[in-house]
Amino acid sequence: MNDATRIWTAVMTLTWLLSAGPLAAAPIGTGRQTVDVNGTPMVVFTYRPAGCPEPSLLVVFHGIARNAQSYRDYTRGLADLLCLLVAAPVFEEQAFPGWRYQRGGIVKNAAVQDARDWTGRLVLDLVAWVRRQEERPLAYSLLGHSAGGQFLDRLAAFVPTEARRIVIANAGSYVFPSLEIAAPYGLGKVYSEADGEAALRRYLEQPLTIYLGQGDTRDDERNDYALAQGNSRYQRGINVFNAGKMLAQQRGWRFNWRLVELPGVGHSARKMFSAPQAFEALSP
């Protein structure tokens, strides 16, 4: 092979590589991939709208039924209208029981776990994986309902992110903005006094939306820590929002939380995600 042929071959190979795009990028329409997220294999259901060349990312978190595929499907309307690439990971129960999923892996058997092992850090790894596949630092938002909302509230309280918006829909419990209440239902017993104040302030400054179905009022909670926050999912959301707002005002801190309510809807991810209020909840 002469020099001219070698140069021509190299140029053509480079051209092909540049035009081929990311090998494992989510396809147009629905998809399913098994992803190694920092050593943890996870199934991720995806949706990419047609006619949307550079979508931002929406990571969706399922409830206790762990039906990530359904949650992916519930957000397709949002994705089409807002140009969103949807990724809905499955947190399998065997690997992610309640303490490690909805309560964030912060505390197990009353013992605070190593911060490097908190489950929310997997979200950062998953976002990094998507960015590598897309070959660009796309912006992202997080959306969770029920147990997925509980998980995202622990993430918002304990794990710094670059999320444009973190939407917590109809969560069964929250991290109450207090250092007097032990984690994972408050921020207590995790930090030193100085670090705790900084963590509390950062929590209130998060771009967090508490998104509530006004009909989610059934008193079906058997957890005393959650019941201390209110007698229903709806009331707990109202109470934690008001407590956060009042504390921020008292301390002179920025308060970036938003409260969005949906009349006539109870504990339904499908209805919450398909309502016009979902756009308000997700807006940066």
Predicted feature locations:
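The feature captures the conserved acid-bearing segment of alpha/beta-hydrolase catalytic domains
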Residues: 165-249
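Bacterial N-terminal signal peptides
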Residues: 9-20
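Short substrate-entry loop that stabilizes the transition state in hydrolases
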Residues: 52-55, 60, 64-97, 176
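Bacterial N-terminal signal peptides that target proteins for export
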Residues: 1-11
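C-terminal catalytic histidine-bearing segment of alpha/beta-hydrolase fold enzymes
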Residues: 211, 221-222, 241-284
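A domain-start/cap signature at the N-terminus of enzymes
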Residues: 21-57, 69-70, 81, 109-111, ...
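Cap/lid segment of the alpha/beta-hydrolase catalytic domain
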Residues: 92-117
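Conserved acidic catalytic loop of the alpha/beta-hydrolase fold
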Residues: 122-138
